[in-house]
Amino acid sequence: MAVQQNKKSRSKRDMRRSHDALTGPTLSVDAVSGEKHLRHHVTADGFYRGRKVINKGSDE
């Protein structure tokens, strides 16, 4: 079983944990529809950066 050789101080422990915080997904609002979506992703209705890039409903 692993046993530490020297006790880690609260400061060292907290410095190690400083990178453990979780962040939520970054959301953007579409300029055309006002819909929220993930950054650098197409919205559900097919718009990306104000342009229609996917025609949903027309299966070719």
Swiss-Prot record:
Transmembrane segments: none annotated. One of its GO terms (molecular function) is structural constituent of ribosome. Residues 7-16 have a biased composition (Basic residues). The keyword Transmembrane does not apply. Keywords: Ribonucleoprotein, Ribosomal protein. InterPro entries: Ribosomal_bL32, Ribosomal_bL32_bact, Ribosomal_zn-bd. It comes from the Bacteria. One of its GO terms (cellular component) is large ribosomal subunit. One of its GO terms (biological process) is translation. Residues 1-28 are annotated as: Disordered. Belongs to the bacterial ribosomal protein bL32 family. This is Large ribosomal subunit protein bL32. It comes from Cellvibrio japonicus (strain Ueda107).
